[in-house]
Amino acid sequence: MPFEIPFLVPILIVILLLVFFSLVPVGLWVTAQFSGVHVKISQLIGMRLRRVIPKNIINPLIKATKAGLNLTTNQLEAHYLAGGNVNTLVNALIAAQRADIELEFERAAAIDLAGRNVLEAVQVSVNPKVIETPNIAAVAMNGIEVIVKAKVTVRANIERLIGGAGEETIIARVGEGIVTTVGSSESHTSVLENPDSISKTVLNKGLDSGTAFEILSIDIADVDVGRNIGAKLQTDQAEADKRIAQAKAEERRAMAVAKEQEMIAEVRSMRAKVVESESKVPLAIAKALESGNLGVLDYYNMKNIISDTEMRQAISGNSEKIKEDDK
């Protein structure tokens, strides 16, 4: 029994040391102390327990302290737990200090948590950024298409980074201004001769209102002549009118054919009535003979007249046929 206790003491010491070094990054603590950042070991243990990686807080804090910024571990840890990028935040604060831009920690943290790249915003505030628009097609009043490509120089407005519109809005507004300016030009030649008029007109519209940027200049990079939209529209209209006329003509033809068929049916109906009436003639003659209204002599005289008429018709028909054959 007395031999077991001394044997367990070294094991317990080793276990305690392992637990201590797993909870406390001693190397990071030593680095912080020599860098002028006074961090307690209890603070590092608390970070471990809160599942915060100590180096993600201490290293940016060392950088900020060396740059002359007055930050605390609580500020950085709170920003880290909120989902922010501590390293980018500290770099942005250092860059703003060097560029003599007023940027407080709370403002920078809010910008970072809003999803903006606060470091890029500070850099664009110092060094303006050039946004290149895609090819923008606009049509002048004479119907000629003009294709314009512009370069917009912007500077970030840190005060409007939260809630301000981004680059897409700038590009859309510039494109709208170009289309409006070209559309109000009487001809495409005036646009080609003086492209600066586009940039001046668009720049005076205050397109950066409500955005996170301040437009410094709008430069026309390229101007090309596109299609003749006016002529194309006239051609399309003529083709449409032609198809409408053809459709109306086809409708009239169909109505004429239908009318012709109606007339043919009407003629056939009248012929049927004539045949029906002719079929009643012998019956009427028989009734007249039976009733005494028509004599036998009168009947034969009528037959002779009918035969004579048929003979004359046959003779006239043959003579007309002979004349046609002679021709």
UniProtKB/Swiss-Prot annotation:
The keyword Cell membrane applies. GO terms for cellular component: membrane raft; plasma membrane. The chain crosses the membrane at residues 7-27. InterPro entries: FloA. Keywords: Cell membrane, Membrane, Transmembrane, Transmembrane helix. It comes from the Bacteria. Its main location: membrane. It is found in: Cell membrane; Membrane raft. It holds the Pfam family FloA. It is a single-pass membrane protein. Homooligomerizes. Found in functional membrane microdomains (FMM) that may be equivalent to eukaryotic membrane rafts. FMMs are highly dynamic and increase in number as cells age. Flotillins are thought to be important factors in membrane fluidity. Belongs to the flotillin-like FloA family. This is Flotillin-like protein FloA. It comes from Finegoldia magna (strain ATCC 29328 / DSM 20472 / WAL 2508).
